[in-house]
Regions:
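Amphipathic alpha-helical protein-protein interaction segments
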Residues: 44, 48, 64, 80-363, ...
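Structural signature of tandem alpha-helical TPR/SEL1-like repeats
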Residues: 2-5, 42-45
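Catalytic cores of enzymes
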Residues: 5, 228-578
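Alpha-solenoid helical repeat architecture
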Residues: 1-2, 14-29, 56-66
Length: 578
């Protein structure tokens, strides 16, 4: 009641002032208070007054908020048609706002807590009888809510900061900060590799220095406008239409795209001549199972002796969690998964699910289908149309150490398989080589340690010969290649930000121009990874497409290494077919 009194007092003041936007906000606050106390008549009255006042104002954010609230009031009152119309108007205002933003960090921050209107529109489209038109419209809203900023960046030219950019001071500051960060990263890694001499206090001090410089680097990148933003002045692109996406699919492909509305998870099944949207489970049921699976996979960090001693129980426990995930996410779709190739488009926490390794009690998904992944169906379609090198060398790079001695064996095996290989090992596997040889390569394979930063995903990195290559560094590379493989630990992990934006190495590689990626979802086993990569590239050279080669490599490695931790860490993203 106190909040209502204060809102009315503020409204009385702003109604007589030259700040009509503030008066609208007061009306919306009064409407929200009434809605939450179930006084729908007052809520409708205040929202209507706010919308009427907006008629003569250019205030798209207020328009978005007002029509979203009015739609929710209509929905609660059972007025589905009126609610739907309000949600559409709210979305249009939001899209107009987003299209005029510059800088991908700003766009992603803008979407935080503003995706509700897309969820409500999906629910509104599916609230009545499912028609082909309502299904297509719902699918369009689902695509609009996924990885839009990444697609914007993929559609715009790559910009690399150079001395001729007119920003030489900023460029020098960036380089100095990157050099300092690489030095501190190396010191931290050296400390961690010496457990008997490790000083937690010293590591903590080094990490404080790292965080300070990372903050400075983010600030400089934002100033210089090279953190992934085009200098062409292009506005935000839209998600592709249903028919544009369909045109990119082969008849053997079924897109399985998930979307969460509230606690409910929906699955969209899109093929060359079908579109279905099926409720499958609740997000709250998935979260705990996924944590248990990740806990099981983390047990391999306890060492090879532990893994060998408890081999059978580790396998059975992991398969049990994979079976539960199958029952929740795929069993409701079992009779509809009739395509040879499944293209999974996850949402939210489902980006951490290894769908290819889900288990029905007898067989894994990869036993029945080839599998690939994409951040959105629109991004998959964009990947199929990318202009990339169809010939050129295979660029092989690796940084072996005592924790990954099989990296050299892996590279030597690939050198014998791939045509026109260029191999760089150790210190010679540098960022300079990648920057200069990468643009002309057809394939790039980097075997090294990956570092996923949950606390600051923009600084997730891979170790190069004398530096660490982060997401920000990838933003400034041009890599128009058919395939980039990172065969290190957790190179495919991302933080899922607002708008289902993936913040990790995959983002930087797609933006740099790669058509497809082969990355890992968790820490990888050294020898099984070498065996997997050898079989994958051998199959690729024999004429199989990337998805077929990945499936064959997984099945071959599983014969010797039956635990999913060892045979199932890798995911193929982007274009999979020839």
């Amino acid at each position: 009641f106190e909040s209502r009194r204060l809102a009315k007092a503020a409204l009385s003041f702003f109604d007589s002032s030259l700040l009509p936007g503030k008066a609208v906000l007061c009306r919306l606050l009064l409407a929200r208070i009434a809605q939450r106390t179930n006084d729908l008549a007052t809520a409708h009255k205040e929202s209507s007054a706010a919308i009427e006042k907006l008629t003569d104002m250019q205030a798209p954010m207020l328009k978005h908020q007002a029509f979203l609230l009015m739609g929710q009031i209509h929905s609660t009152s059972g007025n589905r048609k009126e609610a739907y119309d309000c949600f559409r108007t709210s979305r249009q205002a939001l899209e107009m706002l987003r299209s005029n933003l510059r800088g991908q960090e700003l766009k992603m921050a803008f979407l935080k807590n503003r995706l509700e209107v897309y969820e409500l529109l999906v629910d509104a489209c599916l609230g009545g009888q499912y028609s082909s038109e309502s299904l297509a419209e719902a699918f369009g809203y689902i695509e609009e809510a996924k990885s839009r900023t990444l697609m914007d960046q993929m559609l715009q030219p790559v910009y690399s900061a150079g001395e001729d950019s007119g920003q030489s001071d900023l460029v020098r500051r960036m380089r100095n900060l990157r050099d300092e960060l690489n030095w501190y990263y190396s010191l931290i890694e050296l400390e961690q590799l010496r457990p008997e001499q490790r000083s937690p206090d010293h590591i903590k001090r080094l990490e404080e220095q790292v965080r300070a410089r990372e903050t400075d680097l983010i600030r400089v990148l934002q100033e210089s406008n090279v953190s992934g933003e085009s200098v062409s002045g292009m506005q935000s692109g839209k998600s592709l239409s249903l028919e544009e996406i369909r045109a990119a699919l082969t008849r053997e492909t079924l897109v399985v795209e998930y979307f969460q509305t509230g606690d409910r998870i929906l699955a969209c099944l899109l093929g060359a001549d079908q579109l279905q949207i099926v409720p499958v489970t609740l997000a709250s049921r998935i979260a705990n199972v996924l944590r248990l699976l990740q806990f099981q996979l983390s047990k391999f960090r306890l060492g090879t002796e532990y893994a060998a001693a408890f081999r059978d129980s580790l396998i059975e426990s992991t398969k049990a969690h994979l079976k539960t995930l199958y029952d929740e996410l795929l069993a409701p779709l079992r009779d509809r998964l009739d395509a040879p190739h499944l293209l999974f488009v996850p949402h939210g926490a489902l980006h951490y699910v290894p769908f290819h390794a889900l288990f029905d009690g007898e067989r894994f998904v990869i036993d029945e289908h080839t599998v690939s992944y994409a951040p959105s169906a629109s991004i998959y379609a964009v990947c199929t149309k990318k202009q990339v090198n169809t010939d050129g060398p295979a660029l092989l790079m690796g940084v072996p150490d005592q924790n990954a001695p099989s990296i050299l064996e892996e590279l030597e095996a690939l050198k014998a398989i791939l045509p026109d290989p260029q191999m760089f090992v150790g210190k010679s596997a540098s960022e300079y080589i990648l920057k200069n040889a990468g643009p002309g390569a057809r394939l790039i394979h980097i075997a090294t340690h990956g570092f996923f930063r949950q606390d600051s995903p923009m600084f997730s990195s891979i170790r190069m010969g004398s530096s660490y290559l982060s997401l920000y560094d990838l933003y400034q590379l041009r890599l128009p290649v058919e395939l980039v493989t990172l065969s290190g630990c957790a190179t495919g992990l991302n933080v899922v930000a607002a708008g289902d934006e993936l913040i990790g190495l995959a983002r930087g590689l797609f933006q740099a121009g790669a058509q497809s990626l082969l990355l890992s979802l968790w820490d990888v086993h050294d020898q099984s990874t070498a065996d997997f990569m050898t079989e994958f590239y051998r199959r690729l050279q024999s004429g199989e497409d990337k998805a077929q080669a990945m499936r064959a490599a997984m099945l071959a490695v599983r014969e010797a290494y039956p635990h999913p931790y060892q045979w199932a860490p890798f995911v193929l993203m982007g274009k999979y077919a020839k």
